[in-house]
Amino acid sequence: MNYPLEIHPAGQAPCTVCEPGWLISLCADVRMRHYWDGLPRINLAAGQAWCTGAESDTVCWVETGLLATVFADAQGRERVHHFHSAAHWLTPPFGLPAQDWRIEAQVPSRLLVMNDLQLEEAKVLDKRVHDWMLQALMAERQRLIQREHQWLMFSAAERYLKVLQEAPGWLELVPQHRLASYLGVTDVALSRIRRRLKTGH
């Protein structure tokens, strides 16, 4: 069964709804195990990008690795919407057409890809799975909305310290320009923040 037990090597806590023991127990049912193992998966090398194209209803489950959702802002500059480590759902950024954003692997990664039709197939097999998946997706969306609101109230240095506290593994895996984009600063500003925190000046 393709379910990672080593679920958050990048330091970020796993999805609070997606307890691995629960899914493993549920997939003890042969039909559900075949369903889950039969869902399409995509392997991405570090730096490789993947676009959902016209499939706006696509959602992904990150099995291994660390991914970023990347989009272009109104000025055409690339921005990182969020990072997604293993054992997290990855959903489209709100308000963006499917063709306007992409998924980019920060390290070698594997993601499971699912659309509305496949979610409905889960409902036919076991309504609990369908309800659980929807609950997990809503929880992930809410988490990202809360983070966006929180980011607006934080200074760039406070955002960096938040990442350092919650997901220190990102700092070794994510290229500086991607981390700077996520924090809403330039590469130079991020270097200054790091130097100031290191030296105290």
What are these regions (language model features)?
Residues F154-H201:
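Phosphate-/nucleic-acid-contacting segments
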Residues M1-A46:
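Cyclic nucleotide-binding regulatory module and flanking cytosolic helices
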Residues W89, A139-Q150:
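Short, Lys/Arg-enriched N-terminal segment that forms or immediately precedes the first helix
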Residues A49, L66-F71, R110-L111:
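Short beta-strand segments in beta-sandwich/barrel cores
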Residues V80-Q135:
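Cyclic-nucleotide recognition modules
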Residues A45, E63-T64, S85, V107:
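A cytosolic small-molecule/anion-sensing beta-strand core signal
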Residues D57-V70, A86-A87:
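Glycine- and acidic-residue-biased ligand/ion/polar-headgroup-sensing regions
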Residues P40-E55, A74-G76, H84-A87:
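Conserved short histidine dyad/triad with adjacent acidic residue
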